[in-house]
Amino acid sequence: AKWNEALGRIRVEGGTEEERTIFYTALYHSLLHPNIVSDVNGEYPAMESGATGVAAGYDRYTVFSLWDTYRNVHQLLTLVYPEVQTDMIRSMVAMSQEWGWLPRWELYGRETFTMEGDPAIPVIVDSYLKGLRDFDINAAYEAMKRSATTEGKHNAIRPDIDPYIERGYIPVGIFAQDMSGDNSVSHALEYCSADYA
């Protein structure tokens, strides 16, 4: 019944039965993750601590593959499932309060540091601009500001931020310390996208 309600929020007309099946299968896939991690009593694994937190009045979410989802999935959730997106924003803000940083690619209370950039910022800002405001806006702003202004040696999400702030770009080799696997351009583009938000 819950899946029918979730999938039924979008009604598709026209197309073939096969095309409608493809659409609803894709919609189903977009709703799998992030997923609720809090138990029925609200308990969840707190971010980066091994402690147990309690989500009061909201569902705590996990599996924030934000680099993969900040450009598309969260906009869908904001428009069609705003109550779910609001709980996801609350979860991200709570994570920043628990360990100091918004998540990039969080998995069951741990930051994996997988992928690039600072993708929680555009997700939160987009949700706010579309009218979702039932979260701690001041805490969200402080977390975003901390990420965008803290020097690299103390910045878990943007360790190569110093040249970006000083020069507007990140030189080759700053992050990787050599030319293998250098991500300087992608880091600068992702930081710029987050800062523009």
Language model segments and positions:
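A conserved hydrophobic secondary-structure block that centers on an alpha-helix together
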Residues: 13, 59-63, 73-75, 79-86, ...
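Acidic/polar, glycine-enriched structural segments that form the non-catalytic walls/loops
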Residues: 1-60, 94, 101-104, 133-153
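Short helix-capping and inter-helix turn/linker motifs at the boundaries of alpha-helical repeat units
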Residues: 17, 50-51, 63-66, 114-115, ...
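Second-shell loop/turn segments in exported
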Residues: 7-16, 60-62, 73-78, 110-111, ...
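Active-site cavity-forming subdomains of large catalytic enzyme subunits
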Residues: 87, 91-197
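Alpha-helical support elements that line or immediately flank enzyme active sites
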Residues: 23-38, 62-85, 125-131, 195-196
